[in-house]
Amino acid sequence: STVHRAENTDTPEKVRTILRAFEKFDAPVILPAHPRTRKMIEQINEEEHLKNTVCVEPIGYLEMLYFTKNAVKVVTDSGGLQKEAYILDTPCVTLREQTEWVETLNGNHNVLAHIDEDDILDKVNNTVISEEKENYYGAGDAADKLVKTIISGE
């Protein structure tokens, strides 16, 4: 999970709501905590109450891809992570009222959740993704196509 947007991390109530939802998930939550998020968690003294959520230092891009690919589900407010989860076939719950990547919402591969404990839990526990998925971002073979084009001189 990632939570870093100011609208989700600048008020104690929202951070507390998100963390309490995480604590009720069936699977453990790994939370690479952005400095702003970490500061708020410390300010509201929540970390000592976390049993299901492990706060870790921010991680690199490749590590995040690894975690995303191997996650049961991703919960995030990140714009980019929604798209990466879609490409990696990992269901995503986005903690926002809207998304730049509206195509990821098709087939429930990504769903939007309000900053409300019940809504977050409902979306995490009850969203079923469609078996069908559009290849909006390609088939992952762009590098192969580029190399073939360069080699062929076309």
Map each language-model feature to its residues:
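Nucleotide-activated sugar donor-binding and catalytic core shared by glycosyltransferases
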Residues: 1-25, 31, 37-154
